[in-house]
Amino acid sequence: EALGLNKVKNPVTCGYLEMYNNKDKITLPVKMDSRFLIGPEGAHLNISGISGLAAKTSYAMFLLKAIQDKCYEADSEDDVAFVFFNVKGKDLLAIDQPAEFDNESDKERVYGQYTKLGLTTLPFKNVHYYYPYSAKKVGNTYLSKEAYNEQRINGNAKLYKYDCEDDMKKLDMLFASIEDPNQTMDSIINYIANEQGNFRGLDDWADFLEVVKENCQAGKKNDEISVGSWRKFNRVIRNSIYNNPMFGRIADDNEQTRLEDSLKHIKKNEVHVIDIAKLNEDMQGFVFGDAIR
C-alpha cells in the first residue's frame, strides 16, 4: 500500500518486486496503467540491458503477453492487436507454442511465478505468420521446412509477395535512404504512380523493368526527367526487384498474400508476425514501411 501498487488504474502486470520482512521473502506483483502503453496516453517504451542475452526481447514479449492476457479477460472491455517483426534468426516464429524447459523443476518454478502474477502460462493466441516468398516454396526464412509446413497445415502461415499492379506505387520506400537533393527520384516515382507514359496498365514486374529501361536510352525525350535520373532509378530498382521472387503475381492458392491485404483486415486480439530476418537492409525497410503504412 505504501508503494501505491494496489491503486493503479487499468492495471497490467509488468513484473514483480522481491522484498524481505525480517527473514521472510515477500513477492509483490507490480502493475502499470495500461493506458500509458496501449491507450490514448501510449508512447514508446524503453527497455535497457546487456546486448546479446535476449533479455530485452524476452521482457518485451512478457509484457505483450500480459497485455493480451488482460484483454482476453471475460470482463475486459479492452481489445488490442499486435504486429511483430522478426528481425533475427527465428526468435519470434514459434510464439504460439509452449515454452521449452531444460528440466521439470525450472518449468514448475517459472509457471509458479506466472500464477502468482495472475498471468496464464499459455502461449500467445491467434497468431499469424508471414514469410517472404521464395521459389523454394518454404519462404525466405530461418524456420525449418517441417515447422513451416506445420504452421501452414494449421492455417496460420502465409508467404507474402508484391504484385506489380497493386504495389507499383509503393516503390518510394526503396528510396528512403537514397540521397535525392533535386527530388528527381520523387519525380520519377510520381510519374509512375500516376501511370504516365507506358506505365499505364502494367501488371508484370518484367514489363515494368522493361519500360524503365526504355526511359534510360540515350536520346529519350522527357520534358521533366533526364535520362541520367532514369538510369539512377533503374539501378536501384533492378537491384531490388530483378530476380527477386518476392516481386511477382499472387497465386490464388490461399498460401500467398499481400501484407496490405492481410493487415488491413486485422482483428482484435490477433498477433501478426512478419519475418524479415533474411532480407537485406533495404528490403527490410521496404517491408517495414509497407506494413506500417
Model-based region annotation:
Residues 22-123, 128:
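Glycine-rich phosphate-binding loop of nucleotide-binding enzymes
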Residues 2-36:
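N-terminal pre-Walker A segment at the start of P-loop NTPase domains
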Residues 17, 35, 50, 277-279:
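Short strand-loop junctions, especially beta-strand C-caps/beta-turns
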Residues 71-77, 85, 89-94, 121-293:
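P-loop NTPase motor domains
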